[in-house]
Design a protein with these regions (language model features):
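DNA-dependent DNA polymerase catalytic subunits
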Residues: 1-287
């Protein structure tokens, strides 16, 4: 900690000195002022980052993020608990292994339905008019609630709380998103089951894939550890084919994220799907 504080203090001192030196060259009202620094700092892409922000006091910092899921209101709190939790571990302990253990334990807990229902609630504002109301899930739910009980149904500008629920869906009969969500009170009263898989695949998984794809080579079970140039070679092959660096960069990201999904998420997705289908795993038979 002392070494880290010394490094941070050095950066503050240099920044403040440069600010003072530049000020001699600038005419008022121009001012080049030392402002802040991040350590550690995770950059996902332009205007998408998270890190610990320091200003003048190296003993004080606050976590600051931009453009990532922790800033979005249309996610359930479970995203902040799991994704926010592993971000905290990485930033404050700089321990990827511990963050992976936390992720594994959290996904297992979620797959087993061990989190309180309130952590799964999503809320969205109900507008007075929608061009395509059947495509707006919480509008479909609000209309359904109005049919059940007009007196307690959400009104325009209300925040509508809902939970994703397990529903039977076939290839022939695809359900609207509005038929896959339900009012939390109604869910409890009618003993409905939350769709834990949806929270994993549609809210938690994507940001985690983006994060861990940066350290794919360090993940347990990664199958190309002995081939140090595999991604470099894939990049060359794709670039020869597509002739577009941006498209190739995107494709490499997708491929790396797919490998992370297989390593970290596939067993939980399979576990939930098997539960829905009534298929038991070998561990269910162990006493």
């Amino acid at each position: 900690d002392n070494e880290k504080d010394n490094i941070l203090q050095y950066n503050v001192n240099v920044g403040e000195k440069l600010s003072a030196d530049f000020q001699k060259l600038l005419k008022p009202p121009h001012c080049l002022e030392w402002e802040k620094m991040f350590y550690p700092f995770i950059i996902f892409s332009k205007k998408r980052y998270v890190g610990n922000l320091y200003e003048h006091d190296v003993k004080k910092f606050k976590q600051k993020s931009m453009g990532i899921v922790l800033k979005r209101r249309d996610n359930a709190n479970i995203v902040k608990i799991i994704y926010g939790g592993l971000i905290n571990i990485i930033l404050n302990k700089q321990d990827i292994t511990e963050s992976l253990k936390f992720l594994d334990e959290s996904l297992n807990k979620l797959a087993n339905g061990e989190y309180p229902l309130e952590e799964l609630i999503v809320t969205k504002t109900l507008r007075g008019f929608y061009k395509n109301p059947l495509q707006i899930a919480h509008k479909v739910l609000a209309d359904r609630m109005k049919k059940r009980d007009p007196g307690s149904a959400p009104q325009s500008n209300d925040r509508v709380p809902y939970v994703y629920i397990q529903v039977k869906e076939t290839k022939k009969k695809k359900l609207l998103q509005g038929n896959k969500i339900e009012d939390p009170k109604y869910l409890i009263q009618n003993n409905l089951t939350p769709d834990y898989g949806h929270y994993i695949t549609n809210q938690i998984m994507k940001p985690c894939l983006q994060l861990y794809s940066m350290v794919l080579e360090d993940l347990k079970g990664y199958k190309h550890k002995n081939d140090k140039k595999i991604w470099q070679n894939k990049y060359k092959i794709l670039l020869e084919d597509k002739k577009d660096k941006i498209k190739v960069d995107d494709k490499i990201k997708q491929l790396r994220e797919k490998e992370v999904e297989e390593l970290l998420f596939s067993k939980y997705i399979n576990k939930i799907e098997n539960k829905k289908s009534g298929i038991k795993s070998m561990t269910d038979f162990l006493i």
